[in-house]
Amino acid sequence: MSNNGADLTFGYISCFVAILLFGSNFVPLKKFDTGDGMFLQWVLCAAIWLVALVVNLILHCPKFWPFAMLGGCIWATGNIAVVPIIKTIGLGLGILIWGSFNALTGWASSRFGWFGLDAEEVSNPLLNYIGAGLSVVSAFIFLFIKSEIPNNTCSMDTTPLITEHVINTTQDPCSWVDKLSTVHHRIVGCSLAVISGVLYGSTFVPIIYIKDHSKRNDSIYAGASQYDLDYVFAHFSGIFLTSTVYFLAYCIAMKNSPKLYPEAVLPGFLSGVLWAIATCCWFIANHSLSAVVSFPIITAGPGFIAAMWGIFMFKEIKGLQNYLLMILAFCIILTGALCTAFSKI
């Protein structure tokens, strides 16, 4: 097998692993109360940073580019909304919506050279356009799928640990998400999923920018590595730094009485590890296939995995109409992913 063929094979294998882990990484958290998600966000990001540290040591500590941290900051900002999204519209539908907008944003920025990037070319542009277009179509179909999320009773069994020791203070164990009406649940959940998807789709822009400008002698990034995984430590450091800043701001806003859920620590850590491994696979896929190919594939696939969890494990999606819409959306996603994959060959 030629080097190019080996790269393609390795890239598609990386895509498969990333899809499987991205679609499953929030499953450990589903059975635990996570409150408003701010504490969980910090735990998850701490686990992500530890994985990055291990990868960085394995790669013998490549040069650290601070600008690559910006992508991590963008991702952490979008990730704040994950818990509210899951609580309002469910795991399956949430990942389906934000994955579709993630795909569109990431693909368009690479294909057309947004944000100062070099526009990427593919062997068959028509197939690539069709693949990206089908991702957009699937996103609109997902918006019509209704998920059934159990109402949170806000029992004292799920009261945050830290509030049990506060004397003469009355705190509502419910988060703001739990107080939303059914109609507002769907509006807020879908809106947050779209915003998170756009932010997620922009997360690799700083790294691709550095790689593109490393080929120019007059750039401050001249000579920078072309291997995407060399930037994982800077990227993940940006994630952890940003999540820490947000968590401290949250503690200040809560007057030093944040809602901490100790039972969510280990599941949150596991979720972070799964996400970090999946993202490392995505970095490898970007290097082997290019972002214009990897984005539509990796961002569309996890929705299928998450929806299977939502249907068979958590019973979030029910009814013949919803099942038919899901099947239609999956067929569109599969067709789009195949078109995108073959556009590289």
Swiss-Prot record:
Lipid bilayer topology: Multi-pass membrane protein
Protein family: Belongs to the TMEM144 family.
TM ranges: 8-28, 39-59, 64-86, 93-115, 125-145, 190-210, 232-252, 264-284, 292-312, 323-343
Protein species of origin: Homo sapiens (Human)
PANTHER family linked to this entry: TRANSMEMBRANE PROTEIN 144 (PTHR16119:SF17)
Keywords noted in UniProt: Membrane, Transmembrane, Transmembrane helix
Subcellular compartments: Membrane
Gene name of the record: TMEM144
Protein name: Transmembrane protein 144
GO molecular function: carbohydrate transmembrane transporter activity
Tree of life domain: Eukaryota
GO cellular component terms listed in the entry, alphabetical order: membrane
UniProt xrefs under Pfam families: TMEM144
InterPro entries found in the cross-reference section: Sugar_transport, TMEM144
